[in-house]
Amino acid sequence: MTAQPQVLTIRRPDDWHVHLRDGDMLKTVVPYTSETYGRAIVMPNLAPPVTTVEAAIAYRQRILDAVPEHHAFEPLMTCYLTDTLDADELERGFQQGVFTAAKLYPANATTNSSHGVTSVDNIMTVLERMEKLGMPLLVHGEVTHSEVDIFDREARFIETVMEPLRKRLQGLKVVFEHITTKDAADYVREGNSLLGATITPQHLMFNRNHMLAGGIRPHLYCLPILKRNVHQQALRELVASGCERVFLGTDSAPHARHRKETSCGCAGCFNAPSALGAYATVFEEMNALAHFEAFASLNGPGFYGLPVNEGTVTLVREESVMPETIAIADDTLVPFLAGEAVRWTVKR
């Protein structure tokens, strides 16, 4: 029997999907990401959303101002697609190195997405420009029609939006973000080199029973919502397979405690403090630690055409307990796995 590893040292990872928010929240959460990750794809769903080059430059500076001096961190900015976005503005930002990618939110799919796209037909000119530029399209893959069950919205999106779009624009580079279903796992596995995907730690570790059975756990509520066990298992098998087009994207999405623990709570898990160790735990459980570094540190840069990070990060098998809360201004955050023992800890 092979002895359990006590230390994991990997090339410094990146987070290919994170929400850093703004204001006091941004100042609180940025260090949790910048401490561990060399780069992060920053979501643009502020209020108002990031739709111009100038707004992205200003937001990037606010992020950098919140990075502790001893952290080496590069925020990679994204443009929020709307029905009326100017393709020339998008191209200008991409050519100037301000925008790394553009984000497609179906209108009202998640937090601050009311400005999102009502139909991909409305942004076809923009998407054609992105295809020409080789600019990645990041997709929140859910339909938002009220008659479609919330647990079916990702599968329906593949059928009615994603596949028709990729057939129409066959040179478009697409990241299917935070996939949650066997349908999506199969779709990505069978896809070509222009289709990538991110997966969150919560969707690998938990299913809807964990969120709903024996009491509602609002801090596991995120969008896309946790699915049944068969889907969780499909995601775990996908990462364990070593698929080179699947990479780390935490979708860390902080909300103040009072906005989660309420009669109509917000969607999102603040997992930045524990995500890397959580991923390592899943890979170990799947006997797939041989693929952990690629998932965390190599596959994302490979898909985006960027160099891998210099330096390394070390995780140690050292059980620690996640704090119950994290202070923010005059409120608190409840982190993912709050109060729970975690198996792998990033060595500081």
Curated annotation (Swiss-Prot):
Manner of cofactor binding, per the entry note: Binds 2 Zn(2+) ions per subunit.
Catalytic activity entry: (S)-dihydroorotate + H2O = N-carbamoyl-L-aspartate + H(+)
UniProt xrefs under Gene3D superfamilies: Metal-dependent hydrolases
UniProt-annotated binding residues for Zn(2+) 1: H17, H19, K103, D251
Residues that hold Zn(2+) 2 according to the record: K103, H140, H178
Positions that bind substrate: H19, L20, R21, N45, H140, L223, H255, A267
Enzyme Commission designation: 3.5.2.3
Cofactor requirement: Zn(2+)
Listed pathway(s): Pyrimidine metabolism; UMP biosynthesis via de novo pathway; (S)-dihydroorotate from bicarbonate: step 3/3
Modified residues annotated as N6-carboxylysine in this record: K103
Main enzyme class: hydrolase
Chain coiled-coil ranges: none
GO molecular function: dihydroorotase activity; zinc ion binding
Any GO BP: 'de novo' UMP biosynthetic process
One CC-aspect GO term: cytosol
Keyword Metal-binding: yes
Keyword vocabulary terms for this entry: Hydrolase, Metal-binding, Pyrimidine biosynthesis, Zinc
Quaternary data: Homodimer.
Family indicated by similarity: Belongs to the metallo-dependent hydrolases superfamily. DHOase family. Class II DHOase subfamily.
UniProt-recorded name of the protein: Dihydroorotase
Higher taxonomy: Bacteria, Pseudomonadati, Pseudomonadota, Gammaproteobacteria, Enterobacterales
